[in-house]
């Protein structure tokens, strides 16, 4: 594991949560989670939430959509700590596992997850080919990658190749 990472000023985290709702750092909240999952049944499925932020989506995936278990990753130590507090306060800590992850190979076995959920994550990455290769490795055959992004990195050739 690399050194401690805190990418967000705590005041910004608190402001985002005030604007977007408890447990969220991006727009939409639980309704956005439901929209992203439209047509995909996750009941009793194993999910990976990459870039879990404050844990709101992971909680919704378990509580509202009945995922069996969610492994949730984020790079920021303070955000992971805050997510852990929220997950514990909502009694979801037996169904949501938090891990600080700072890139490279995902710390999971191949073919481990039924669904990979990500929002506002890949837009922060340089090595999209490596990122999506790792997603492919840990996703079970027939699984789903679902999510949304703030923007498309048009100047990134790996993204253009993936997007075409």
Task: Give the ranges of each region predicted by the language model.
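A short acidic, Gly/Pro-enriched loop at the edge of an enzyme's catalytic core
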Residues: 104-115
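Class I SAM-dependent methyltransferase Rossmann-like catalytic core
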Residues: 14-27
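Conserved alpha-helix/loop element of class I SAM-dependent methyltransferases that forms part
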Residues: 26-43
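Short, glycine-/aromatic-enriched active-site segment of Class I SAM-dependent methyltransferases
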Residues: 151-164
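A short glycine-rich, Lys/Arg-flanked "PGG" loop and its adjoining helix->strand segment in the class I
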Residues: 129-144
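N-terminal, positively charged/glycine-rich alpha-helical extensions of SAM-dependent methyltransferases
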Residues: 1-17
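A short SAM/SAH-binding and catalytic strip from SAM-dependent methyltransferases
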Residues: 115-127
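Class I SAM-dependent methyltransferase SAM/SAH-binding core
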Residues: 48, 54-105
């Amino acid at each position: 594991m690399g050194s401690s990472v805190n990418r967000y000023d705590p005041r910004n985290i608190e402001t985002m949560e005030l604007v977007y709702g408890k447990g969220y750092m991006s727009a939409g909240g639980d309704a956005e989670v439901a929209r992203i999952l439209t047509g995909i049944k996750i009941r009793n499925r194993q999910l990976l939430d990459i870039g879990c932020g404050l844990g709101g989506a992971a909680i919704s995936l378990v509580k509202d959509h009945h995922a069996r278990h969610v492994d949730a990753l984020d790079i920021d130590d303070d955000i992971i700590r805050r997510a852990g507090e929220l997950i514990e306060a909502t009694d979801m800590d037996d169904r949501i596992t938090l891990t600080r992850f700072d890139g490279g190979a995902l710390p999971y076995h191949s073919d481990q997850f039924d669904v990979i959920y990500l929002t506002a994550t890949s837009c922060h990455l340089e090595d999209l080919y490596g990122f999506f290769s790792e997603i492919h490795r840990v996703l079970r055959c027939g699984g789903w990658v679902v999510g949304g992004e703030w923007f498309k990195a048009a100047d990134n050739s790996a993204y253009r190749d993936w997007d075409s």
